[in-house]
Amino acid sequence: MIYIDNRQNKIKVNEELENKIKEIIDYALKEEKVNIDYEISVVFIDNNSIKEINKDYRNIDKATDVLSFPMLDYEEGEVFKDIYLNYEFDESDLDEGNLVLGDIALSLEKAEEQSKEFGHSFLRETCYLTIHSVLHLLGYDHMEEDEKVIMRQREEEILKSFNLHR
């Protein structure tokens, strides 16, 4: 189950965008071997809202493009398919039968700014940020160079499947 909640009014959100986001998330999770019913919440917000969240949770006083709040625990360098592929989740891990993977807060305002800066479409940027965040929910990171290379490769492979290029 994918929940999308639009809590901003600076960028128009249409059904096409919401459907593409859901399609990208579903595809990415299948590619990453998530073989259980899941729940992810995506909240579309503006720069002021994401700045406040950054300040509250990361002690960073600026707007960023996307934030991920994973619900599962991962050791450094491990991702979902490494440790949870055949894991027996118990009822305390599930919400109405769905594994709660986490929440995504995405600034559509920042996505629009970055799409112009990088010279590609708003849809491509929003899909990229969604994939990036989903991979974080699955344990991927980019703090170390080797992890960054792996994460970027996965992002590009998924984008390519949807014919979304830079």
Curated annotation (Swiss-Prot):
Cofactor names: Zn(2+)
Subcellular location: Cytoplasm
Cited Pfam families: YbeY
UniProt signal peptide: none
Residues that bind Zn(2+): 132, 136, 142
Keyword Hydrolase found: yes
EC numbers: 3.1.-.-
Co-factor note (free text): Binds 1 zinc ion.
GO biological process, one term: rRNA processing
A single GO cellular-component term on record: cytoplasm
Keywords for this protein: Cytoplasm, Endonuclease, Hydrolase, Metal-binding, Nuclease, Ribosome biogenesis, rRNA processing, Zinc
GO molecular function, one term: zinc ion binding
Main location: cytoplasm
UniProt record similarity statement: Belongs to the endoribonuclease YbeY family.
Function recorded in the entry: Single strand-specific metallo-endoribonuclease involved in late-stage 70S ribosome quality control and in maturation of the 3' terminus of the 16S rRNA.
HAMAP family per the UniProt record, alphabetical: Endoribonucl_YbeY
Name of the protein this chain belongs to: Endoribonuclease YbeY
Organism encoding this protein: Clostridium botulinum (strain Kyoto / Type A2)
